[in-house]
Amino acid sequence: MELVAVKEGLARILVPKAERIYDAPVFYNPVMSLNRDISVLAVKVLGPKRVLDALSATGIRGIRYALETPAEEVWLNDISEEAYGLMKKNASLNIDGELYEEGDRSYLWGEKLVVINKGDANRLMAENFRYFDFLDLDPFGSPVEFLDTALRSVRRNGVLAVTATDTGVLCGAYRNACLRKYLAEPIRGPLCHEAGLRILIGTVVRYAAKYDLGVEVLLAYHRDHYFRAFLKLKSGAKKADKSLSQLGFLWADKSGRFEYRRGFLPDKPGASGPLWLGPLKDESFVEELLESARDHPLAHKKTLSFLQLISEELDVPFHYDTHTLARACSLTPPKLDVIIQRLRELGHSATKTHFSPTSVKTDAPFGVVAEVMKNV
């Protein structure tokens, strides 16, 4: 396996040389550096003591946690023998200390403890009940097969950070797969990315409720080919009930009109869901991320601007795609800034959204938005 050096954040690691990243024997995706930037900032702000990167590959995520955050104990895990060897090599390159090996586990002792494990992620999480303050699930595809053990491996009031890269499934391109994996009906069209993210969160909420765990969304977003959510777990049946009460269903038509309602079952045909209808961010948490990002060695040039966009985004369910509305009204789409300004002049809240460059988030009803589109 030929290796090349790459730098990301404060880490300098070795990764396999390959023409296509998916052909490499150990996976490393530079596009996900923004994801890792935000994750590092989250750990820095939250200050957990024990962190697990359950699916580590090269080890870049866990190594950055060890280098760039106050975490005292960081675990890296992968089932691949090649990944295990590379994780040990990369950890030793970046973190001072002596490496001790015991079977399929190595310990790097220095200012912090870095544990490098070769094994099945589900088994590792099952063996460490309520041990980790921050648990990161960043799989290839769906995280569903890891949710039961992950939820039970996080301490009370700990955080589960979960990624899903099966956007085609959650966005409705593979409806049957979404029904199987997420037990939810997806939606196609301009709302698919927000609905897909909310289906993912709704699935975690339903899994967590089995263990009397409620879910508080600190931050959830869509970017590139993936969905990402930082979820604080709250113990107690009442907390679980409260989270379940935030689930519901979405209806949308080709004109861009949508409606949503909370409830355990849909009350009319054509519904998408169940999905999360609660907030997608904790505003104070996002502000802390932004503040921390301004003086942090970020790996991706767009991390700061992306967080800024999310911080300014109106946190209401779903958005109006102005191009869809324009087609329905036989109009040329007006400039988004003009639409937002006019809605604000009418007394409504309105912002851009990270889900789509042609959409507006607003508390204005469909009729008002359509009328603004016709008259600006």
UniProtKB/Swiss-Prot annotation:
S-adenosyl-L-methionine binds at residues 36, 61, 78, 120-121. It catalyses: guanosine(26) in tRNA + 2 S-adenosyl-L-methionine = N(2)-dimethylguanosine(26) in tRNA + 2 S-adenosyl-L-homocysteine + 2 H(+). InterPro entries: SAM-dependent_MTases_sf (IPR029063), Trm1 (IPR002905), TRM1_arc_bac (IPR022923), tRNA_met_Trm1_C (IPR042296). The keyword RNA-binding applies. Coiled coil: none annotated. Its EC number is 2.1.1.216. It comes from the Archaea. Belongs to the class I-like SAM-binding methyltransferase superfamily. Trm1 family. NCBIfam families: TRM1. This is tRNA (guanine(26)-N(2))-dimethyltransferase.
